Amino acid sequence: MQSAKPLFDYPKYWAECFGPAPFLPMSREEMDLLGWDSCDIIIVTGDAYVDHPSFGMAIIGRLLESQGFRVGIIAQPNWQSKDDFMKLGEPNLFFGVAAGNMDSMINRYTADKKIRSDDAYTPGGMAGKRPDRASLVYSQRCKEAYKHVPIVLGGIEASLRRIAHYDYWQDKVRNSILIDACADILLYGNAERAIVEVAQRLSYGHKIEDITDVRGTAFIRRDTPQGWYEVDSTRIDRPGKVDKIINPYVNTQDTQACAIEQEKGNVEDPNEAKVVQILASPRMTRDKTVIRLPSVEKVRNDAVLYAHANRVLHLETNPGNARALVQKHGEVDVWFNPPPIPMTTDEMDYVFGMPYARVPHPAYGKEKIPAYDMIRFSVNIMRGCFGGCTFCSITEHEGRIIQNRSEESIIREIEEIRDKVPGFTGVISDLGGPTANMYRIACKSPEIESACRKPSCVFPGICPNLNTDHSSLIQLYRSARALPGVKKILIASGLRYDLAVESPEYVKELVTHHVGGYLKIAPEHTEEGPLNQMMKPGIGSYDKFKRMFEKYTKEAGKEQYLIPYFIAAHPGTTDEDMMNLALWLKGNGFRADQVQAFYPSPMATATAMYHSGKNPLRKVTYKSDAVTIVKSEEQRRLHKAFLRYHDPKGWPMLRAALERMGRADLIGPGKDQLIPLHQPATDTYQSARRKNSTPAGSHKVGKDPKTTLIQTQHTGLPPRGSDGSKPWDKREEAKAAAMARNKQAAKERMDAAKGGKGKGGKPARKPVVPR
């Protein structure tokens, strides 16, 4: 794989003399205090500004600041007018626009298209502080505010909408967001390299329209430039006329002339020697090859072509062998350069080692930002995921190659949290990333890695070229928990259990020291049909890991539980599959409360299946096998009801479905039967977590969850209490103990008031006031 210029090798911009700001400014008053007369770059984001490396605007802002640029932040502006977009003045170089850490549509709507009642990235968790399709709206307002200032579009929303994409909320294929947003250039994936290169070039006076050779960018152009070889992939191959094989020794440019000479009937002398001229065919080099995808008009009207385009796109995601792509949108082309080169360990350390304040901007006062509260004591140790799950967009956004931080950098960040972050109690809530256990796991051969086009390194089985050694991660865990002032290191990121079982030593280390009562894992299903479409391992891998987990838990003398979570209504899932999953859940004693239905997010492979009914994991043709799709609201409710087989509200629907499927034998009181024959006299079931089902502003909380239930959020964790706490949090234990002491003291005071007698007629002891 080709190398890239290191992030720390660029010359600094002249404004470096101002030094790093305590916080990137959000107002003119803050700019004045810093001595700035203007911003070089202004970042507009749909999230509240938290100066922490888990928030995209903080990473990009601090990175640009480290290059010497003066960077301002406009967080969650009022998009109804251009006024908020002008409050920091006109930027000298460009506006950087992002919707935030989440796609704005997924952030606002549930998988059933219901409006969410909260927003974790907003102070107070308040919903409604960002528009739908925020990247598009913000870009248009920036252009309205300052017409001639370039707009650089980035973030996960823009990244996953860079190509013509199926939009679940409108149920149609939309243009590339670059067309609708009026932006000048789009940066996709983790954009550190691209944003620094673009900023540096603009600072040298280059025009934004001339920046067309930066990896990880998309832009609009009129036609294919000279010197490029275009591969036409606008149609699906089909049987047709086979052309006559041309004589390879004939100069094709002179074929017509040869035909004329032959018509003259001249007879050549067989004894006369002739010089044969062999013409070199034009060589197709990867660096100058572009693949033309079907146009937006074609994929909008032909779902099979859409699936074909999705397949080609995903085959061109390896930075080592990816070629440029181009897609026609009306009269213009949207051009996609190959993905960015992954960052080295030194560069990852550089990015995560910048002077983050690690707290929200002071402008928010004491208002809590739920997303920050969730991650303020967590540490990101790597990026990327080679799992390739078709319903997930992490691989499309962060890449398949794992980008690791050094152990020294991670330890420094833990020490910084210990010494700097308010409220630290000695517990690191997570040491992970997109997955918990892919740290320093990679292909054994860089050459093979650069040439590979497989969508997953672990499906249908673990690739023999994948190094599954967990020793670096084990050493990191041991070093982290040995730090003074650190009481506990928890692992809250999702565990890839099919990888973990390859290293029993790792499972033992994890279970013995790093599980806080619950460990979340994601089998997603039990049946082969949906698992194959998800590219997830069979349930046998889960069973193997469960045995190891229980063995090492028992050896450690602990009481710990696995929290498996599942997806309903995923492409490839039949009613019978969901029935079998429900039987498995009941047989294993699981009662899932909060259920996640499949959410068709932009650009995901499973979304292409959902829209087209075809499987882009294989060659797509009009006659290729169809994929079972669950689209109707009624069937989606049925699949969720199977997962919540214990909820009486779903029993009438399940009875009708089981009778229709010829499985009425599963209706009855037996332990091997799924649901009772009759409804209860009163509905006693109540969800332990009713988020998104209560009106905005309501703070009702259900009854305490029973220990036999699995109450899972979309993260797979048990539900939070009314105050946002976690069940295993030590603070909750202390609070419960204090309440018990209060009750005991109150009882003793009452006894004293009644006659000064305690138990057995003895004088009551003086009440103890709890501290």
Curated annotation (Swiss-Prot):
GO molecular function, one term: iron ion binding
Bias (Basic and acidic residues) ranges: 726-735, 745-754
Protein residues bound to [4Fe-4S] cluster: 385, 389, 392
Location of the region described as Disordered in the Swiss-Prot/TrEMBL record: 683-771
Cofactor note: Binds 1 [4Fe-4S] cluster. The cluster is coordinated with 3 cysteines and an exchangeable S-adenosyl-L-methionine.
PROSITE patterns the UniProt entry points to: RADICAL_SAM
Family stated for the protein in its record: Belongs to the UPF0313 family.
This protein's name: UPF0313 protein PSPTO_4928
Annotated organism of origin: Pseudomonas syringae pv. tomato (strain ATCC BAA-871 / DC3000)
